[in-house]
Structure formats: C-alpha cells, structure tokens
C-alpha cells in the first residue's frame, strides 16, 4: 500500500484541503458475532438445496446450511444487536466525511493454496479447505464491516504499477453515497499524480 501510505503521510492530502486522522473504532471489534449472510442465504436457497444441493460448491453449501441452525429469537436478537452496533459506529464516525481503510488486508493468495478438494489426498484437501476459510474470512473482514453497517463504500486501486493490485476503501454509513463518491474522486485525483 505504498501509494496509499503516501496519501496519508505525504502532503498531497493537505494540499487538497483534506485532513486525515488515524482513529480507533472500538465498535468494529464488537460487531455481532453471528452474521446475517448464512441465515438470509439459507432462507433463499433452502428449497434449491433440497432439490439440487449436489450442484453447489461444497464450501458454499456448508456456509449456507449453517443458517438453518439459527432460531427465530436468535435472529431477532441479532437484528437488535446490529441496530445498537450501527448506532455506536455512527457515533464514532459522525465527525468524518469518509473513512479510509484497506479494501482487503492481504494480497490475493495463490489459487493452489485454496483450490477446492480434489479427493486425492484427504490431508491436503483438509489443509486447503482450512486455508480457504482462513483467507476468505480475511478477504471479507473489512468489507463486511461496511455491509453490516448498511453503509456505502468503494475501492480505489492504489498499488504501485507492476505490483499486485490493492485497493483503498473509502466508506461511511448509510445514505452517505454522495459524500463518499466526492471524497473518492478527490483521492483518485491525488493517486493519479
């Protein structure tokens, strides 16, 4: 993230009239432990899984089927916890036009490290599955915060030419799209220098 680092540490942001602060968002660590994706995906896919579950990627199917275990009262508790979490997040974010973070915290893994099981070597298949889920959780970590927030975001390419691509995520809460787009346009102009 050398280019993004220059944006934060260099004078280009100051020259553009921006002030960049490094802040802590403790509420990020307090987000509801059980996500919405599995129960909502299961609600949509459950009949398809019964009819043609073998046509699903086994890893995807396993994640979707976890949604069947959530009880209605747990889902309602989850919705309420999310609303409280959003309020805490917005309280911490309200004085900022937008927030900046890496879109993902790592560069893309080698496909061979996370390729689906091939059934030849059970130990290797298990290791690849474990690595897939570890990497997948990392790749979803930062964007999931914005999703749970019901926020808006975009990712600006900010890598040095010739290096693996990385993105700078510009984000905020719900209905802040215009501001996020305007801030992103200004950042994009700085990054293109």
Specify the residue positions occupied by each region the protein language model found.
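Short helix-loop capping/hinge segments that flank enzyme active sites or metal/cofactor-binding pockets
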Residues: 36-90, 155-165
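Short low-complexity, flexible loop/linker segments enriched in glycine and/or proline
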Residues: 30, 34-39, 115-117, 169-171
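Short, surface-exposed loop/helix-turn segments at secondary-structure junctions
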Residues: 33, 77, 108-140
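Short glycine-/small-residue-rich Rossmann-like dinucleotide-binding loops
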Residues: 104
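Gly/Ser-rich, acidic/histidine-flanked active-site/gating loops
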Residues: 1-35, 57, 69, 74, ...
């Amino acid at each position: 993230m050398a280019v993004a680092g220059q944006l934060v540490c260099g004078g280009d942001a100051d020259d553009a009239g921006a002030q960049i602060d490094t802040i802590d968002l403790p509420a990020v660590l307090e987000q509801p432990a059980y996500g919405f994706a599995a129960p909502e995906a299961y609600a949509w896919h459950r009949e398809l899984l019964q009819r043609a579950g073998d046509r699903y990627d086994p890893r995807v199917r396993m994640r979707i089927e976890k949604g069947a275990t959530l009880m209605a009262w747990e889902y309602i508790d989850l919705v309420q916890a999310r609303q409280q979490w959003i309020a805490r997040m917005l309280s911490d974010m309200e004085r900022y036009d937008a927030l900046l973070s890496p879109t993902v915290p790592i560069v893309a893994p080698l496909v061979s490290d996370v390729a689906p099981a091939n059934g030849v070597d059970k130990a290797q298949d298990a290791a690849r599955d474990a690595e897939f889920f570890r990497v997948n959780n990392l790749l979803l970590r930062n964007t999931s915060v914005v999703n749970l927030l019901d926020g808006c975001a975009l990712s600006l390419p900010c890598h040095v030419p010739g290096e693996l691509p990385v993105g700078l995520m510009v984000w905020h809460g719900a209905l802040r799209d215009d501001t996020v787009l305007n801030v992103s346009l200004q950042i994009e102009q700085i990054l293109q220098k």
